[in-house]
Amino acid sequence: MQRSVHELLTPRTIDVKESSATRAKVTLEPLERGFGHTLGSALRRILLSSMPGCAVTEAQIDGVLHEYSAIEGVQEDVIEILLNLKGVAVKMNGRDDAELTLSKKGPGVVTAGDIKLDHDVEIANPEHVICHLSENGEVNMRLRVARGRGYEPADQRGLDEDETRAIGRLQLDATFSPVRRVAYAVESARVEQRTDLDKLVIDLETNGTIDPEEAIRRAATILQQQLAVFVDFDHEKEPERVEEEEEIDPILLRPVDDLELTVRSANCLKAENIYYIGDLIQRTEVELLKTPNLGKKSLTEIKDVLASRGLSLGMRLDNWPPASLRGDDRVLGG
């Protein structure tokens, strides 16, 4: 293999071995020495802390005012029920929140599969146990599901709603990340005569709302988006605001020669860097009278010519000079 000593290897092989619908090992090779840990650590952090997903964030249980309660006929206390609700793997399609209900009478086991779902909401682990009911036990609850990212403690959510939140609306710490566990290992790899290369092996498990391969793909996309700014530092700059200029009356863009003034008056104006009609109308009578060789007779001539075109001296143009004339040094007084 002919390769410049300055050229870094890029991975050529990616292998995905799924041991189940929720667990897989992803192998990436070859990598330059050290890149296995660099990429493995970054992807692991993103997979655990930054992946978007859905979770139960609030529960209302009939007859329960706070989490330190107990429900007659239910084996678990409310705190245990809330902990079990955190383990429900929810997936929403095309929406950011949902209100779900769960009602069941005993005896029996209450599972995630007993939750009544909307058409665009799925439960990936319907067998997940929520609580156990005795013969006379009954449970009725309303659950709020929301979309988020990573982990969100209940005390950091909706602080502005605390005063209006009804008693009995129990808040849950939410683990939105669909990734349950991630581990990575770096092994030795070989390419022809080189034996100092890395092979990255990522072992991950999800909650079933996303397959492991897609989880890796999303994590890599997040990492790519975060690093993109370093590829082109122009991305750091805020887009320049292009201010829309008001339409300029075309007559103002015409040279003063078009006014057909006397040679004396025209030469006096050019001596003061007044080349366009737009320049002229912004001057006052006092300013023009200070122009060498321009007397009251010439001033009257200029005023009359401008008046015949519906213009006058002392007018104000906020957007002058326009972009079309900014390259003309004469307009800038050059």
Curated annotation (Swiss-Prot):
GO BP terms: DNA-templated transcription
Stored SMART domains: RPOLD
Keyword field: DNA-directed RNA polymerase, Nucleotidyltransferase, Transcription, Transferase
SUPFAM superfamilies: C-terminal domain of RNA polymerase alpha subunit, Insert subdomain of RNA polymerase alpha subunit, RBP11-like subunits of RNA polymerase
Ranges for region Alpha C-terminal domain (alpha-CTD): 248-334
GO MF terms held by the record: DNA binding; DNA-directed RNA polymerase activity; protein dimerization activity
This protein's record includes keyword Transferase: yes
Catalytic activity annotation: RNA(n) + a ribonucleoside 5'-triphosphate = RNA(n+1) + diphosphate
NCBIfam families the UniProt entry points to: PRK05182.1-2, PRK05182.2-5, rpoA
Protein name per its UniProtKB record: DNA-directed RNA polymerase subunit alpha
Organism (species): Marinobacter nauticus (strain ATCC 700491 / DSM 11845 / VT8)
This protein's encoding gene: rpoA
